[in-house]
Amino acid sequence: MTFEDLRQKLKSGEVSSKELVQEKINRINELDPTLNSFLIVNTELALSKAEHIDKQIASGDHLPPLSGIPIAIKDNLCTKGIKTTCASKILDNFVPPYESTVTKKLLNAGAIMIGKTNMDEFAMGSSTETSAFGPTLNPWNITKVPGGSSGGSAASVAAGLCYGSLGSDTGGSIRQPASFCGVVGMKPTYGRVSRWGLIAFASSLDQVGPFANNVSDAAEILQVISGKDELDSTTVDIPVPNYLETLSKSIKGMKIGLIDNCFDHEGLATDVKESVLSSASLLENLGAEIVNISCPRFNDGIATYYVIAPSEASANLARYDGVKYGFRAEDEQSLIEMTSKSRALGFGSEVKRRILIGTYALSAGYVDAYYKKAQQVRTLIRRDFDDAFKKVDVLLAPTAPTTAFGSGDNIDNPMAMYLSDLLTIPANLAGLPAISLPCGFDKSDLPIGLQLIGNVFEEGKLLQVANQFEKAAEVYKNRPKTDFTL
């Protein structure tokens, strides 16, 4: 059921907003003790707002587009008066005194914030296993991970616990879990959506975006949260087009480039490769022209990312010292001891690992050899994309090299975990928009994600291609069983 379907049902009185919210709360109470996709459920607040919206509907008031629709929020987005932990012990009791720009826009659009979703601690991870509050499980198979770091947002949509959600994407943290959980997930162009109120991981890479069950719902959420924000100087003052208007347009004559480097990689699973290539053939049948494109430095993205992102993280996370807010170690004799112990006890092992990597890369003897060189390679990756978009409209690749891997399989193997973001990282380094949508299933009936990458601020074109594929393939209609038998 799309947002438009819900609007019609609410307007006609066939269903009330309170009923929509209560149904999702009941479902959360039934399924989430197993999945652990939510950290906080706003039961009373959500029902109260739903009742208010129902009264407005009964009075015939003109309502904003997402009125009465339950949406979940990743727990690294500040929500005024509602605890925001970033899935970390160090922020366990942090209650923001302000609202992030994107959540404020959603609330102004009438959306009902049903809860805050689980994630990898400080968005550092690819499996939602580094959360201080326990891992999230994949609703398609609870022995598998949902991906990360926005695993709770992806799993909650896939399991039908909400109609849409917000996540953040630094190196694939929306698209990879969207692929693993069989939902639509989109990372906008860097600067399209405000980061004000997003707890920072890597400021030059982080971007907020939507999860949804279908492309049109993702487009609606993106429409609401996009735009210039005076509180975030990295947002760009470019008019936001009407994304819904382009969804139904034909893709006949559009050039779509297959990124050769992705399909040649030895870590790419056969099922994934075959499904994505089959998806390219379907797009060709819809009138698109499929061409091969080489991005020579595409596979250099992962090494580049794991210098730049930890370097930025080491600076951003220096603010958590136990002094002004967050977890504070007790019984320490000096400020230095208190700060050291607060960070040692408050941060998890993956966060500490990345802080150490970043601190090392920025140290006096190594900043030129590592950080400066990584920034130079980042520029070359961006130039490869610039060259590619002179020849094609959209690029096509798998979202992830594999389908969802087993819980615990990679948690003690950082290199294996990092490689799961191999195909998503380059778009972040170049600041490009990219979307993942379900395109098939592997032999174990786990979802496979198709990734489309666009040129800067061409989200509309991406959504157009994605929507035409979705309507033709109809993979999105498959939903996970919810008895959660092993």
Curated annotation (Swiss-Prot):
List UniProt keywords, sorted A-Z.
ATP-binding, Ligase, Nucleotide-binding, Protein biosynthesis
Q: Which Pfam families match?
A: Amidase
Provide the catalytic activity annotation.
Answer: L-glutamyl-tRNA(Gln) + L-glutamine + ATP + H2O = L-glutaminyl-tRNA(Gln) + L-glutamate + ADP + phosphate + H(+)
Q: Source organism's superkingdom?
A: Bacteria
> What's one GO-annotated cellular component?
glutamyl-tRNA(Gln) amidotransferase complex
- For the keyword Cytoplasm, the answer is no
Question: Quick check: keyword Nucleotide-binding in the entry?
Answer: yes
| InterPro entries to which the protein is assigned, alphabetical | Amidase, Amidase_CS, Amidase_dom, AS_sf, GatA
Similarity annotation: Belongs to the amidase family. GatA subfamily.
Q: What does this protein do?
A: Allows the formation of correctly charged Gln-tRNA(Gln) through the transamidation of misacylated Glu-tRNA(Gln) in organisms which lack glutaminyl-tRNA synthetase. The reaction takes place in the presence of glutamine and ATP through an activated gamma-phospho-Glu-tRNA(Gln).
HAMAP family reported for this sequence: GatA (MF_00120)
The name on file for this protein is Glutamyl-tRNA(Gln) amidotransferase subunit A
Q: What is the lineage of its organism?
A: Bacteria, Bacillati, Cyanobacteriota, Cyanophyceae, Synechococcales
